[in-house]
Amino acid sequence: MARKGLIEREKKRKKLEQKYHSIRGSSKKEIRKVPSLSDKWEIHGKLQSPPRNSAPVRLHRRCFLTGRPRANYRDFGLSGHVLREMVQACLLPGATRSSW
């Protein structure tokens, strides 16, 4: 189980990312359109003004049961060991264990 503080920090980052998403997107489009290098540097400075935690790169996918940030399966939103336990307990319909 992940610490509650880390999970809350992740929620805060997600809110910040949603808040500044349009600003970052518009700045990136402007950089692509502007031909002169000096104007690109100016727009790049604007792109650096939002907080660091508003960058989408800083977000992690977490298991929604345990909060574990690693070994997540996107299709299920679960970490690997939780997914395996749920499949063994037949809690995920349609998922089967491989056997050969």
Curated annotation (Swiss-Prot):
Belongs to the universal ribosomal protein uS14 family. Its main location: plastid. InterPro entries: Ribosomal_uS14, Ribosomal_uS14_bac/plastid, Ribosomal_uS14_CS. GO terms for biological process: translation. Keywords: Chloroplast, Plastid, Ribonucleoprotein, Ribosomal protein, RNA-binding, rRNA-binding. One of its GO terms (cellular component) is small ribosomal subunit. This is Small ribosomal subunit protein uS14c. Residues 1-29 are annotated as: Disordered. GO terms for molecular function: rRNA binding; structural constituent of ribosome. The keyword Secreted does not apply. Binds 16S rRNA, required for the assembly of 30S particles. Residues 1-10 have a biased composition (Basic and acidic residues). It is found in: Plastid, Chloroplast. Part of the 30S ribosomal subunit. The keyword Ribonucleoprotein applies.
